[in-house]
């Protein structure tokens, strides 16, 4: 009997800033997700400060500290295995795509920028 596995991806808001003293806002969406194993997952962040140049995605497993998953400078795409980070500076929008989701992907994902 084969059971369908689910991957729980929890998204949190994270605000990081090291660029002068201007007000900066970062917002993540969607909220908590449950997706079938093997699906493609899209996690998104929007930001308000066009001065941001460094874009990071962190993964944090339960009861562990966050670990750097992807790092991108300026704009464009960066791919690492099943993970792709995409930055669109003109829209102030970044995304993380996870292909072929696995149970081991169950974690909290955080976007950060500076």
Curated annotation (Swiss-Prot):
Keywords: Adaptive immunity, Cell membrane, Disulfide bond, Glycoprotein, Immunity, Immunoglobulin domain, Membrane, Receptor, Signal, T cell receptor. One of its GO terms (cellular component) is T cell receptor complex. The keyword Disulfide bond applies. Transmembrane segments: none annotated. InterPro entries: Ig-like_dom (IPR007110), Ig-like_dom_sf (IPR036179), Ig-like_fold (IPR013783), Ig_V-set (IPR013106), TCR_variable_domain (IPR051006). One of its GO terms (molecular function) is peptide antigen binding. Residues 1-21 form the signal peptide. SMART domains: IGv (SM00406). Its main location: membrane. Disulfide bonds join 45-111. Residues 24-114 form the Ig-like domain. Glycans are attached at residue 44. One of its GO terms (biological process) is adaptive immune response. It is found in: Cell membrane. SUPFAM superfamilies: Immunoglobulin. The keyword Thylakoid does not apply. PANTHER family: T CELL RECEPTOR ALPHA VARIABLE 1-2, T CELL RECEPTOR ALPHA VARIABLE 12-3. Alpha-beta TR is a heterodimer composed of an alpha and beta chain; disulfide-linked. The alpha-beta TR is associated with the transmembrane signaling CD3 coreceptor proteins to form the TR-CD3 (TcR or TCR). The assembly of alpha-beta TR heterodimers with CD3 occurs in the endoplasmic reticulum where a single alpha-beta TR heterodimer associates with one CD3D-CD3E heterodimer, one CD3G-CD3E heterodimer and one CD247 homodimer forming a stable octameric structure. CD3D-CD3E and CD3G-CD3E heterodimers preferentially associate with TR alpha and TR beta chains, respectively. V region of the variable domain of T cell receptor (TR) alpha chain that participates in the antigen recognition. Alpha-beta T cell receptors are antigen specific receptors which are essential to the immune response and are present on the cell surface of T lymphocytes. Recognize peptide-major histocompatibility (MH) (pMH) complexes that are displayed by antigen presenting cells (APC), a prerequisite for efficient T cell adaptive immunity against pathogens. This is T cell receptor alpha variable 12-3.
């Amino acid at each position: 009997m084969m059971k369908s596995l689910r991957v729980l991806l929890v998204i949190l808001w994270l605000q990081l800033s090291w660029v002068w003293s201007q007000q900066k806002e970062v917002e993540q969406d969607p909220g908590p997700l449950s997706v079938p194993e093997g699906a493609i997952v899209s996690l998104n962040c929007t930001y308000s400060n066009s001065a941001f140049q460094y874009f990071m995605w962190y993964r944090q497993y339960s009861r562990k500290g966050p670990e750097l998953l992807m790092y991108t400078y300026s704009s464009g795409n960066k791919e690492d295995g099943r993970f792709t980070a995409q930055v669109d500076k003109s829209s102030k929008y970044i995304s993380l795509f996870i292909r072929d989701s696995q149970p081991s992907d169950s974690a909290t994902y955080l976007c950060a920028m500076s």
